[in-house]
């Protein structure tokens, strides 16, 4: 197994759950550092209609999780941009500022992603960033958690 200097992982982390933690733990096994790219609030509102926690709150939590070295909030140039390419670019520029070495970076993907369904794949190739697959199964979803909590609250109030 190749060992990287940096493994990038990304997500909404809204809210963070055990699947995210498994992804970070597996990334940590493959890299000296794990850098997390968080989707911003606008991205989440465009995808889900709302954000459960603010981007600053999510970044604060993620930055304190064991194994996470750096965090970046992705700020796409346009609201229609559904990628984290802006965050990848920020990570590459940070790497070049901090390390006087050839880029040793991978973009890690969870179990719900595979070749062909990751819009950042070509962008990563342009920077010689390797793609790593199966950093955990889709064991949980932030949307599932919010829906479950909402339904439980609704049932309790109507019970």
Predicted regions and their residues:
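Nucleotidyltransferase catalytic core that binds NTPs
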Residues: 1-159
């Amino acid at each position: 197994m190749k060992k990287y200097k940096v493994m990038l992982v990304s997500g909404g982390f809204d809210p963070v759950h055990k699947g995210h933690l498994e992804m970070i733990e597996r990334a940590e096994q493959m890299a000296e550092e794990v850098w997390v790219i968080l989707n911003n609030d606008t991205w989440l509102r465009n995808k889900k209609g709302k954000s459960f926690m603010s981007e600053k709150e999510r970044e604060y939590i993620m930055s304190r999780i064991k194994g996470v070295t750096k965090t970046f909030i992705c700020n796409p140039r346009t609201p229609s941009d559904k990628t984290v390419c802006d965050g990848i670019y920020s990570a590459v520029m940070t790497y070049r500022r901090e390390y006087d070495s050839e880029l040793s970076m991978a973009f890690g993907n969870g179990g719900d992603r595979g070749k062909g369904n990751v819009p950042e794949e070509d962008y990563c190739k342009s920077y010689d960033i390797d793609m790593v697959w199966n950093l955990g199964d889709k064991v949980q979803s932030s949307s599932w958690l919010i829906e479950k909590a909402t339904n439980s609250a609704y049932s309790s109030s109507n019970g």
